[in-house]
Amino acid sequence: MTNGESRSNGERARESVTRGFCRGWSWLQVAASMALIASPSRAVADATTPPFHLLRYDDNYSYLAHRQTSDFTPWEDLKYIPLDRESPGGPFVSVGGEVRFQYIERWNDQFGRIPGAQGSLQQRYLWHADLVGSDQVRIFGQLISAWEQGRKPTSLPTDVDHLDVQQLFAELKSAPDAAAKGYLRIGRQEILLAGHQLLKIREGPDVRLSFNGARAHVAQGDFDSDLFAANVVQPRAGLFDDSWTDHSVTFAGLNLGWHPKLSGLANVRADAFVFDYRNRSVRYEQFAGTEHRQTYGLRASGRSGSWEFDYEGSLQSGTLGPLAIRAWGVAFFTSYHWDSEPTKPKLTLGLSSVTGDRNRSDREINTFNCLFARGDYFGDTSLLTGSNTLDLSLLTDRELVQRLHVSIQWDRLWRSETTDGLYAPPLIYVRSGLVSDSRDIGNQFTLTATLSVNRFVTVQLIGSAFVAGDFIKAGPTKTGTEGLTMRTQFKF
């Protein structure tokens, strides 16, 4: 047997063991979820316990310290495990997890580069434990296992990670009676900043975005600030092989926030931020090489009566090899709520403009980098990121019946500059601007139905269709793309 064959057999054996481990865990979690759902005390728990957060380290079950453990529901037994039952209010462990299955069907994916129908099954398993040592010290850890079957020609790196550490950090908090509240987190962590368009956690794909580094947060009165510096975790398909020291992509930033209480306005927030981004290998239409980019931005959001707004604008500078970066992007979203109606409908009008490169022969590049924006920037087909696009969008959503939420979104897309091409998430150059002078990219339609069975189970159906415009039709692959996603998620 050759060394190559031996390694191949070893890899298959490890993969088999890991798959068996994950399947066992998945069935255990599903069974646990079903048991919790069937528990006769669930109605009480649903009414008195907090919802699960998108970032699970934000879940806080310290309030259970003031109740008798003998009165706990089966679910609460997992959420508060005191290390010393003789000392209520002392150190405790809280555990939880998630199982997510999603079937994705695509027709003529990537503008027809992959013709016909293609289906894939994705599975994601997350397990976490939160060790709370005191009011000021804790350690949070989370494992991830992500699998995909059926994707052709191959799975994306953000959809497969057989078993690895998603998060593992230590947190030091300020004293409970301190005037300024804050914390310092050091380790692998997910980062989300107050609704920013340029920093999301990549929830759509199987593997969420995480960073190796440090984050400091301070809040006092109407002001808060965040300072962070980290390298971006690059997911790999194997076992515990996501590097802790890979600095090929780094990200640092400072965000200053102000959230005053103003008469006639609710949920008002204003942010000023600066981000520093480095990528050792990136490709744009004009040039490929090492990128060092700074982003300076302002954001404002809030609500007045039935009206709601969320506006953000950014300037970018820096270098891409020998080229100077000069780019900008703005996004405006204005919503109107009909809260008195039984279905509580909401209508949102959006307009975003993101620059592309204006001149291939000069010493500048004007393509805006959307950094870590949502992968489904223009719908669930995830065909494009915002770079070099002008987007007019209309979104309507409502609760048809209790727990069933439906939304319909339309995006009309043009190129900002005819001298630049198009980019797929996260920033992959997919189409040259040379194929046509047309700005017309096309229309994207998305229908989303979300059924919240209870606090543990969510079922979602997403249908999307991209209708190709003149620029797409002029290319080597020139069709629209349709997609259907069926997603079931269990959390505990």
Predicted regions and their residues:
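Extracellular/periplasmic loop regions
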Residues: 49-72, 285-286, 312-313, 323-435
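Residues on the lipid-exposed face of transmembrane beta-strands in outer-membrane beta-barrel proteins
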Residues: 97, 123-131, 167-172, 214-218, ...
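Outer-membrane beta-barrel strand-turn architecture
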Residues: 87-89, 131-135, 174-178, 208, ...
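Structural signature of outer-membrane beta-barrel domains
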Residues: 102-106, 136-138, 142, 146-148, ...
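N-terminal periplasmic/intermembrane-space "pro-region" immediately following the signal or transit peptide
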Residues: 2-4, 22-28, 36-117, 128, ...
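Surface-exposed loop and membrane-interface regions of Gram-negative outer-membrane beta-barrel proteins
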Residues: 105-123, 131-181, 197-201, 238, ...
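Outer-membrane beta-barrel "beta-signal"
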Residues: 61-63, 479-492
